Swiss-Prot record:
It is found in: Cytoplasm. One of its GO terms (molecular function) is cysteine desulfurase activity. The gene is iscS. [2Fe-2S] cluster binds at C328. HAMAP family: Cys_desulf_IscS. It comes from the Bacteria. InterPro entries: Aminotrans_V_dom, Aminotrans_V_PyrdxlP_BS, Cys_deSase_IscS, Cysteine_dSase, PyrdxlP-dep_Trfase, PyrdxlP-dep_Trfase_major, PyrdxlP-dep_Trfase_small. The active site is at C328 (cysteine persulfide intermediate). This is Cysteine desulfurase IscS. Pyridoxal 5'-phosphate binds at A75, T76, N155, Q183, S203, A204, H205, T243.
Length: 404
């Protein structure tokens, strides 16, 4: 068993060996290394064909038309292109955008930038289970609302939004619907022939593909127009200029094809391991799951261990690669803004750990994790005066702390 045990699949996934092997065929002189935009010779034609196949594979994963797939450098760029692209193209129709307080920074900071440009953004607060009820979304919509941006699966707590129902609402209200599916594409079934989603951001490195490549789904019927944010050679039907990274795209296509084929069996195994982990730690006193217990992706488990400081717990769990919050913000000592939006106080938010399980996690690793967590929590609480007071029946909310 390799230590530390990797339980941070929501931050990134290792590239599947089958994907890596395929990518190697598209880099060197012996392989297909040409520029897909080179139309005058075989090197270019072969590369273009490889890109077309990968585009089909990504489209099949979400049941879309391959012509609706725009390759980008990842979900962050896809989010930027979708939100800024819609805002700048449709600004004469309205300048109001709706999103939630628990979105990824790539969505929140893009919206903040648009606010500086004169757009108005409503940031909705979720219920304590992390989900925004459809009535709340409808109530926030106005005559001048042009866009709703909402994630499918939350990166920190794993809760799932019902994008089918929300899509119906948006279509009825003539509001463009963007979904950040970085955490759900390749893990949950997505059918864009059925779901009325207009734009969808996808990342390869969250589904065992390479980093640095992603896609944006842009609906053709009814047609969604975007203003480009990257200008140049007019690649990707003018929406995203820049030479296509054939080997990355091939890797993303292969990862999508494997994810589609193995989704059911992968999820059944991951769910078993997730349940095994929770069953092994739920007996620890003052331990709570964050986010809806049912409506969540099976590989995600965000747990608060009361009376344990998150950073000291992370250090105690040095044999486990886990995170507190998302990878993009786990370097900061601020409590997770997602958990704060759920109504958790600073202490509970600080004592939370995100465990995310994936394709290569084993039972042996889960059992070792349970043992490590149980032991570490016990040791840390033994040192905690707060735990001692709590066990003595002191109501800590009534304690007047002296200010030094």
């Amino acid at each position: 068993m390799k230590l530390p045990i990797y339980l941070d699949y929501a931050a990134t996934t290792p590239v599947d060996p089958r994907v890596a092997e395929k990518m190697m065929q598209y880099m060197t002189m012996d392989g297909i290394f040409g520029n897909p935009a080179s139309r005058s010779h075989r090197y270019g034609w072969q590369a273009e064909e490889a890109v077309d196949i990968a585009r089909n594979q990504v489209a099949e994963l979400i049941n879309a038309d391959p012509r609706e797939i725009v390759f980008t450098s990842g979900a962050t760029e896809s989010d930027n292109l979708a939100i800024k692209g819609v805002a700048h193209f449709y600004h004469k129709k309205g300048k109001h955008i709706i999103t939630s307080k628990t979105e990824h920074k790539a969505v929140l900071d893009t919206c903040r930038q648009l606010e500086r440009e004169g757009f108005e953004v409503t940031y909705l607060e979720p219920e304590s289970n992390g989900i925004i009820p459809i009535e709340k979304l409808e109530a926030a919509m106005r005559e001048d609302t042009i866009l709703l941006s909402l994630m499918h699966v939350n990166n920190e707590i794993g809760v799932i939004h019902d994008i089918d129902a929300i899509g119906e609402l948006c279509r009825a209200k003539k509001v463009i619907f963007h979904v950040d599916a970085a955490q759900s594409a390749g893990k949950l079934p997505i059918d864009l022939q059925k779901s009325k989603v207009d734009l969808m951001s996808i990342s390869a490195h969250k589904m065992y593909g390479p980093k640095g490549i992603g896609a944006l789904y842009v609906r053709r019927k009814p047609r969604i127009r975007l203003e480009a944010t990257m200008h140049g050679g007019g690649h990707e039907r003018g929406m995203r200029s820049g030479t296509l990274a054939t080997h990355q795209i091939v890797g993303m296509g292969e990862a999508a094809a494997i994810a589609k084929a193995d989704m059911e069996s992968d999820n059944a195994r991951i769910r078993r391991l997730r349940d095994r982990l929770w069953d092994g730690i739920k007996h620890i006193e003052e331990t709570y799951i964050n986010g809806d217990a049912e409506q969540r992706y099976c590989g995600s488990l965000n747990v608060s261990f009361n009376f344990v400081e998150g950073e000291s717990l992370m250090m105690a769990l040095k044999d486990l690669a886990v995170s507190s919050g998302s990878a993009c913000t786990s370097a900061s000592l601020e409590p997770s803004y997602v958990l704060r939006a759920l109504g958790l106080d600073d202490e509970m938010a600080h004592s939370s750990i995100r465990f995310s399980i994936g394709r290569f996690t084993t039972e042996e690793e889960i059992d070792h994790a349970i043992e490590t967590i149980t032991k570490s929590i016990g040791q840390l609480r033994e040192m905690s005066p707060l735990w001692e007071m709590f066990k003595d029946g002191v109501d800590l909310s009534t304690v007047q702390w002296a200010h030094h």
